[in-house]
Amino acid sequence: MIYFDNSATTKMAPKALETYSQVVTKIWGNPSSLHKLGDRAHGLLEASRKQVADLLGVNTDEIYFTSGGTESNNTAIKGTAWAKREFGKHIITSSVEHASVANTFTELENLGFRVTRLPVDKEGRVNPEDLKAALDKDTTLVSIMGVNNEIGTIQPIKEISEILADYPNIHFHVDNVQALGKGIWDQVFTSRVDMMSFSSHKFHGPRGIGILYKKRGRMLMPLCEGGGQEKGLRSGTENLAAIAAMAKAARLLLTDEKEKADREYAIKEKISKYLAGKPGIHIFSPLKADFAPHILCFALEGIRGETLVHTLEDQDIYISTTSACASKKADEASTLVAMKTPDAIATSAVRLSFDESNTLEEADEFIAAFDEIYQHFSKINHLGE
C-alpha cells in the first residue's frame, strides 16, 4: 500500500497510541475532581499543555485544548466576532480558506457581520496590499490560513503581520492545521499572530482533539457554557488520553523536523519532475520555497479527479481530490476556482500529500502506476497532438 493522503489524516504514531492506552487505563480520573485521582489527571493535563506550549514557543497559559481544527477555527472566529461586536462588525478572510473557516464567515455574514474575502493570485496567494486597503475602523478580525490545504500555498503571514502591527486591536488568526512539522514555522508564525489552530490527526495523533493558541489578553466569547474548563473558554471534561497522546505526537513530529520535511520535499520533487512538461498535465504546487514541502496538487486534463483517485485505488495507491473535508461536495476545488482555473481543469485536480514515512521508492511506484494511466488517457484524449 502507498498512502499519499496525509493532509486528509495520518496514521497514529505507535508511541502516541501507547500513551493513549496507558492514560485511558491508568490515569482515568477527572482533572476537575478534588481527590488524588483528579490531582493526578490534572497534573498530566497541565504537563501536556506545557509540552505543547514549549514545542510551539509560546506561554503555557496560551494553549487551549479543543476537539480539533474545526472547533479551534470556530472558537477563534466566532469568539472574536461576538466578543468585539460592539467595537466593529467588519471581519476579513481570504477566498481560499478551509471550509471550517469559510463557512463560519458565511454564517457570521448571515447574522449581520460585514465580510471581506480577499482575492488570490494564480498561485492561490493573497496580496498583503489588498488586506491593507480593506482595513477600516470597524475591522476586528483577520483570519488567513498559514498553508493552503488543497495546493500547499504558504500565505504571506510575515507581511500581513507587519501591516497589522499598526492595528493592535485587530485579532489575527492563522489556521495552521497544515503547517506544523513542515520546516516552515518561521513563515507561518510571528509575534503578531494572536490565535492559531491545530489538529492532532494531521500529525499522527488521535482524532477528535486539537489545539487553539490564544495570546494573553485577547478576549474571546466561548461557544458553549458549562463547567468552565480550559479557563472558561471550552467547557466540558477534558479528553485527557487524547491530549496526552497528541502532546506525544507533536514532540515526535518536531524531533528532526527539518530532516523529515526534506524527505517529503524529495518525494514531491521526484514526482513533480516526472509530471513537468507532459501534455495535459497542470501542476498547481510548484517546487518553490513559498509552497509547503508535503503537498502536490496537479490535474490531468480529460479525466475527472475522482476517476483518477479510484483508478489508483485499484492498485492500492491512495490520494485525494483536493480537500478531503469537502471532496464529496460540488465545491471541492474551491482554491482552484478562486485562482480562476477553468472548470474542466479544476475538476480534474488531485492532491498528493506526504509524510516522513513515505519513501522515494514509493514515489517510483506511483510514477510507474500513473504513467500507465497517463499513456492510456493520452491516447483517448489525443493529448499532445
Curated annotation (Swiss-Prot):
| Location of N6-(pyridoxal phosphate)lysine modifications | K202
User: InterPro entries given for it?
Assistant: Aminotrans_V_dom (IPR000192), Aminotrans_V_PyrdxlP_BS (IPR020578), Cysteine_dSase (IPR016454), PyrdxlP-dep_Trfase (IPR015424), PyrdxlP-dep_Trfase_major (IPR015421), PyrdxlP-dep_Trfase_small (IPR015422)
Q: Which keywords label this protein?
A: Iron, Iron-sulfur, Metal-binding, Pyridoxal phosphate
Q: Where does pyridoxal 5'-phosphate bind?
A: G69, T70, N149, Q178, S199, S200, H201, T237
* Gene Ontology MF terms: catalytic activity; iron-sulfur cluster binding; metal ion binding
Hydrolase among the record's keywords?
no
Task: Tell me which residues bind [2Fe-2S] cluster.
Answer: C325
List, separated by semicolons, the cofactors it needs.
pyridoxal 5'-phosphate
Keyword flag Plastid: no
Q: Which catalytic residues are annotated?
A: C325 (cysteine persulfide intermediate)
User: Which SUPFAM superfamilies does the protein's record reference?
Assistant: PLP-dependent transferases
Give the similarity note: Belongs to the class-V pyridoxal-phosphate-dependent aminotransferase family. NifS/IscS subfamily.
This chain belongs to the protein called NifS/IcsS protein homolog
Which taxonomic lineage is given here? Answer: Bacteria, Bacillati, Bacillota, Bacilli, Lactobacillales
